[in-house]
Amino acid sequence: MHPRFQSAFAQLAENLQSALAPVLADEHFPALLTAEQVTMLKQATGLDEDALAFALLPLAAACARADLSHFNVGAIARGVSGTWYFGGNMEFLGATMQQTVHAEQSAISHAWLRGEHALNAITVNYTPCGHCRQFMNELNSGLELRINLPGREPHTLGDYLPDAFGPKDLDIKTLLMDEQNHGYALTGDELTQSAIAAANKSHAPYSQSPSGVALECRDGRIFSGSYAENAAFNPTLPPLQGALNLLSLNGYDYPDIQRAILAEKADAPLIQWDATAATLKALGCSNIDRTLLA
């Protein structure tokens, strides 16, 4: 079990501990539960889905990297496939606050980058901030997404974001988590191809500036992140954050990164290179390359 889970695991009910122990045994547990594992945990504990998600929130919060605030927020995104995806807030010392990943963004990006096509619900241990409510409004689940908070009845995103502004106001038809492929040819080595594939998956309807980042760890594992724009612009999630989020959720740390590649268009209206390189250098990675989409 990864050390980050030990304290939270000790606080779980005994029957949940017994059922989860084999799942968490891998130090690189991927911070997700398959539909089969969710069913197994429900049977082992007698909990329904909402109650089980609440019981698991301490494990999601343990995934947070709150190096500045020391305020761990955890979220669990529940996919239509039945898979549950953990997420936690991420803060990057030496970078800027604008590089922060919120827990809801973490869980949603996690689900999206794992190939989930839509969400039924998201469970969070603290009320979503306005930034996250706006981020969630970009999803193809729209204002019907169910939000579960401890001690409260479930509500929809529409309840938390009345009179919402979103992609439909800008006549955007393809939404976040809809399948997209920008069609750029996969060239170069495996890491470069991973970055291009991530760029192809980008949700960039406002700037037409697709981009992707791929990170290679010292053991050869590769984690990729895709760019996710938002109708309100500021809640946009850069591709580096998507990749760092996956890396961290899988039990790796920033010193494990030995090489990084950004894929983007040379003539794009928005460029990720400077912010990507600055953040990676703040995290101790200086082996950073850029490949141009063509």
From Swiss-Prot:
One function term, GO molecular function aspect: identical protein binding
InterPro entries: APOBEC/CMP_deaminase_Zn-bd, CMP_dCMP_dom, Cyd/dCyd_deaminase_Zn-bd, Cyt/Deoxycyt_deaminase, Cyt_deam_dimer, Cytidine_deaminase-like, Cytidine_deaminase_bacteria
Domain CMP/dCMP-type deaminase: 48-168, 186-294
Keyword Transferase attributed: no
One of the protein's GO biological processes: cytidine deamination
Disulfide bond entries: none
Matches recorded under CDD domains: cytidine_deaminase
Single GO cellular component term: cytosol
Annotated positions binding Zn(2+): H102, C129, C132
Keyword list, A-Z: Hydrolase, Metal-binding, Zinc
Xref: Gene3D superfamilies: Cytidine Deaminase, domain 2
UniProt-annotated catalytic positions: E104 (proton donor)
Cofactor note: Binds 1 zinc ion.
Cofactor requirements of the protein: Zn(2+)
UniProt binding sites for substrate: N89, M90, E91
EC number: 3.5.4.5
Catalytic activity: cytidine + H2O + H(+) = uridine + NH4(+); 2'-deoxycytidine + H2O + H(+) = 2'-deoxyuridine + NH4(+)
Enzyme's top EC category: hydrolase
Family: Belongs to the cytidine and deoxycytidylate deaminase family.
Job description of the protein: This enzyme scavenges exogenous and endogenous cytidine and 2'-deoxycytidine for UMP synthesis.
UniProt subunit comment: Homodimer.
Protein name: Cytidine deaminase
Source organism of this protein record: Enterobacter sp. (strain 638)
